[in-house]
């Protein structure tokens, strides 16, 4: 195995996980903040807001998991070797 390809794969895997988690992390923080603000304004809508928030958080977290899958593929099933 070429050490240059191995090093590039490790760096690419780290970047894949790191960059794939930035967007969803910011989005989840913003969504949670807005949900808390919405519940504070309208406490009677708490159930509907919470359900929508949890569903949207799951979709955002899926993007991070896709980045993790790409990183694991680069580390353990490297297509460049």
Swiss-Prot record:
GO terms for biological process: proton motive force-driven ATP synthesis. The chain crosses the membrane at residues 3-23, 57-77. Signal peptide: none annotated. Keywords: ATP synthesis, CF(0), Chloroplast, Hydrogen ion transport, Ion transport, Lipid-binding, Membrane, Plastid, Thylakoid, Transmembrane, Transmembrane helix, Transport. It is a multi-pass membrane protein. F-type ATPases have 2 components, F(1) - the catalytic core - and F(0) - the membrane proton channel. F(1) has five subunits: alpha(3), beta(3), gamma(1), delta(1), epsilon(1). F(0) has four main subunits: a(1), b(1), b'(1) and c(10-14). The alpha and beta chains form an alternating ring which encloses part of the gamma chain. F(1) is attached to F(0) by a central stalk formed by the gamma and epsilon chains, while a peripheral stalk is formed by the delta, b and b' chains. This is ATP synthase subunit c, chloroplastic. It comes from Populus trichocarpa (Western balsam poplar). The gene is atpH.
């Amino acid at each position: 195995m070429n050490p240059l390809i191995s090093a590039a794969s490790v760096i690419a895997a780290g970047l894949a996980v790191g960059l794939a988690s930035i967007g969803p992390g910011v989005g989840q923080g913003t969504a949670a903040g807005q949900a808390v603000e919405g519940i504070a304004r309208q406490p009677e809508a708490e159930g509907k807001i919470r359900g929508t928030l949890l569903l949207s958080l799951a979709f955002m977290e899926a993007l991070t998991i896709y980045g993790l899958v790409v990183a694991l593929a680069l580390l353990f099933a490297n297509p460049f070797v």
